């Protein structure tokens, strides 16, 4: 196991990590990032609003590099895709699974990934 991982293994809290999620997202700039999750269902494993806030906070780095951010800092209603920028976000009602966001991810990714004509469906 990586030695640095052991520093954060155990009874530590979020405040013990020396970086925040928006900094990790900003490190991806200027590359596209799709952030998705299910609605919070009381299990404590999903923090959709926190995910959104991190995506929005990474926006200035994307803009600095000439790319588009989320386009808003207002948390959207569930099932509302924000996919016009280079950072994308969508929250679904399907629980703790990525499957309901796949169609939206594919729509977002299609702007960046182009299949050769011979492999495209006709």
Q: What residues fall within each predicted segment?
A:
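Conserved strand-to-loop "acid loop" that flanks and positions the catalytic carboxylate
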Residues: 29-48, 91-95
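C-terminal catalytic histidine-bearing segment of alpha/beta-hydrolase fold enzymes
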Residues: 56-57, 62-122
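N-proximal short alpha-helices
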Residues: 24-27, 78
